[in-house]
Regions:
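Reductase modules of NAD(P)H-dependent flavoproteins
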Residues: 1-117
Length: 117
């Protein structure tokens, strides 16, 4: 089923999606989320506590749209456990929420592959 929440109540239920989401997850197999980075971070955290996959469509500036300018990079943990700066325009814009290092967006985290030591 589809549940819609808008902060202003213009569609669906009024409120932030993080308010009612806990009650919706009991029979949920996967979460698809799009919106501001703060909301995606919050939903991904909730999903991780319930061990539910969360596909997050990030809203990142994509100046060139083909990966050359590197303005859309995000720190994402790979299947090998290594953090890499990935381009959301070419390798995304959808990422597993538990793999994005939400607190490190806008910088290169320590230990990132190819990053400063």
């Amino acid at each position: 089923s589809l549940s819609i929440f808008t902060e202003d109540g213009s569609m669906g239920t009024q409120g932030r999606v993080t308010d009612p989401i806990q009650g919706l997850l009991d029979n949920t197999d996967i979460i698809y989320a799009c919106g501001p980075m703060g909301m995606l971070k919050a939903i991904s955290k909730i999903a991780a506590t319930k061990e539910i996959p969360c596909q997050s469509a990030v809203e990142e500036s994509m100046a060139c749209g083909i990966g050359i300018c590197m303005t859309c990079v995000l720190p994402v943990i790979g299947d090998d456990g290594v953090t890499r700066m990935v381009r959301s325009c070419t390798e995304g814009p959808i990422f597993e929420g538990s793999k994005v290092r939400w607190d490190e967006i806008g910088r290169v985290p320590p230990g990132t592959y190819g990053g400063p030591k």
